[in-house]
Amino acid sequence: MNGFTNKDFETFNINGLDERMEAIQTRIQPKFQQIGESLAEDLSKKTNNELYLHIAKHARRTVNPPNDTWLAIADNKRGYKKHPHFQVGVFDDHVFIWLALIYELPNKSKIASAYINHFDEVKNLPTSYVVSLDHTKKDAISLTDLNKSHLERFRDVKKAEFLIGKHIEKGDPILANGDELYQFIMDVFEQLLPLYQLAIDSRDE
C-alpha cells in the first residue's frame, strides 16, 4: 500500500487545468485505486452491504484546475453524491478522511434530523475529530465547537453540508507509510460507522 508524498501535495501548485489533471491522474489516482479497492472491500464486510469505489473525475471543469481530489465509497454503483459516503482526499496541505453528506442528498433533512436526535453520539467521537460544512473549502471546525445549530442549518439550508472525520496535515510521518495510513483511515471509518448506518437507515425510511 502506498502512502502520500510531498510530490502528491505539490500537484496542486501546478498551473493549468490539463497539466494539473495529468498530475492528479498519474500521481494520486493510482494510490486512490489501491487504497479505495481495499476500503470498498473492508467496508462492505463491516456494513454487510456492497459498497463501491468512485474516483473523482472533475469532468465538469473546463477552466479552473481542482484544488483537491478524492475517492469516495458508497452503496451505489453509479454515483456517490446523492448518498451518504466515505471520502479520502488530498488538498495541498492535508489529507481528509470524511463521512460525507453533501448538498445533492435527496433525504438530507431526514438524515440531519436523525443526527440532531442522536447529537450526543455525534459529540461522543474523539475530540480530535473535525467537521466541515462545505466540501469545497479547506476550513473545518473542531468537533468540540459543533453545536445543534450547525445541524439545523444542514437540515434547513439546501446547499448546506455535513462532513465529519479527520485531517492529517502534510508532513505527518504516517502519510509516508501506506500500511499505517490505511489502518488509520479504517480506524476513523470504523468509528464513523454508527453515524453512516444512521444516515442510511434515515434515508431508507
Swiss-Prot record:
Coiled coil: none annotated. Pfam families: DUF1054 (PF06335). Gene3D superfamilies: Protein of unknown function DUF1054. Belongs to the UPF0637 family. This is UPF0637 protein OB1420.
